[in-house]
């Protein structure tokens, strides 16, 4: 195990070491000071290359908060503008009144790609598919995480407003985020593995709605897809940002407190969710995003800390929950 932890947070260090994860990292800034920056294990499945501070990790939906923050920065509060004001083709099939806020808060009515995705690297084709789609529900009338479509909706708005692809825009505006990896970044990216063999099937589930939303492109959770150069260099902003725990923790530490923009029983998550602009917001003020596989990042403004945990071992959130419990005890 490498890195450091302030002596006041020795309990967090002990909890991190006790996880025994094959490759992971944890970062916590508190009251403006970096108090935890730990990493351990191996970057590769063969366990020949040790994890380093620069190891990049595929963080799945944790990246949604980053791409959303990029659009929020660009629009400077113009969230009630129609999406079609920036993306005219989007007005098709009754979407002329759909706003940027609807998109950012997962209420745009496009929670799934309407057709099978044959090429996840086809940015313009997938955006055209969404622009032409008929919404599954009128914008603003239901809450449903746009698990796979979110990045193309938000990312295309970034491209229409700024002129750059979302990956290039995020590189220019933030530090430590790789959306569409270069060869050099791929060389230091963690190799994903399953914590247990049935993880993909359990994640997708058997519910028809969940499968339609999550399993498109079909089979994308296979390790030979997720670890492939083609997937890593693609821009799929909803799910394939690569980054470090430290970059995520610093990102959250710099964000202002977040407001709730939509709330209700989320059709995908099957629980009540308060959505901000790209993040889930608790009634007590904490805000953040987790990703399938166990990566997790959030901020707690009331207690003055931010938190990010990343792992290459795809499993549940029990690891992050144990770390958060240890952190709260130290505070």
PLM regions with names:
Residues 1-42, 54-58, 142, 147, ...:
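Catalytic loop of the DD-peptidase/beta-lactamase superfamily, centered on the K-T-G motif
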Residues 4, 18-27, 46-103, 138-148, ...:
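Short active-site loop at a secondary-structure junction
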Residues 11, 99-102, 125, 149, ...:
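Extracytoplasmic/secreted proteins, especially bacterial periplasmic and envelope-associated proteins
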Residues 17, 84, 108, 131-135, ...:
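Amphipathic, well-packed alpha-helical segments that form the structural scaffold of globular domains
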Residues 46, 127-136, 221-232:
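The feature captures the short pre-catalytic strand/loop hairpin that immediately precedes
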Residues 53, 61-62, 75-111, 115, ...:
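Active-site helix/loop module of the DD-peptidase/beta-lactamase fold
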Residues 65-70, 149-156, 246-250:
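Short amphipathic alpha-helical face segments that pack within enzyme cores
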Residues 77, 124-141, 147-151, 155-167:
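Conserved, well-structured beta-alpha core segment at the onset of a catalytic domain
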């Amino acid at each position: 195990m490498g890195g450091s932890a302030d002596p006041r947070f020795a309990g967090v260090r002990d909890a991190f070491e006790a996880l025994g994860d094959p490759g992971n990292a944890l970062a916590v800034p508190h009251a403006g000071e970096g108090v935890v920056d730990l990493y351990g294990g191996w970057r590769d499945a063969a366990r020949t290359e040790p994890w380093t501070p620069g190891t990049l990790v595929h963080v799945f939906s944790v990246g949604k908060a980053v791409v959303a923050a990029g659009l929020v920065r660009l629009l400077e509060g113009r969230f009630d503008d129609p999406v079609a004001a920036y993306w005219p083709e989007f007005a098709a099939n009754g979407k002329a009144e759909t706003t940027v806020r609807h998109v950012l808060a997962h209420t745009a009515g496009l929670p799934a790609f309407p057709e099978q995705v044959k090429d996840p690297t086809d940015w313009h084709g997938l955006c055209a598919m969404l622009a032409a789609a008929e919404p599954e529900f009128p914008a603003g009338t239901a809450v449903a995480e746009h698990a796979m479509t979110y990045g193309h909706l938000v990312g295309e708005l970034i491209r229409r407003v700024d002129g750059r692809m979302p990956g290039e825009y995020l590189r220019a505006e933030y530090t430590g985020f790789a959306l569409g990896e270069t060869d050099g970044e791929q060389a230091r990216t963690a190799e994903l593995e399953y914590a247990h063999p049935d993880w993909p099937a359990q994640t997708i589930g058997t519910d028809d709605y969940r499968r339609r939303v999550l399993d498109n492109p079909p089979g994308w959770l296979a390790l030979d897809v997720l670890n492939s150069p083609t997937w890593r260099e693609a821009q799929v902003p909803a799910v394939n940002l690569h980054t470090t725990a430290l970059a995520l923790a610093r990102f959250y530490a710099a964000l202002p407190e977040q407001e709730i923009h939509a709330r209700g029983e989320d059709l995908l998550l099957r629980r009540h969710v308060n959505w901000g602009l790209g993040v889930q917001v608790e009634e007590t003020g904490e805000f953040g995003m987790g990703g399938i596989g166990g990566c997790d990042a959030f901020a707690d403004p009331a207690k003055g800390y931010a938190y990010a945990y990343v792992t290459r071992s795809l499993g549940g959130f029990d690891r992050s929950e144990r770390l958060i419990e240890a952190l709260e005890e130290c505070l």
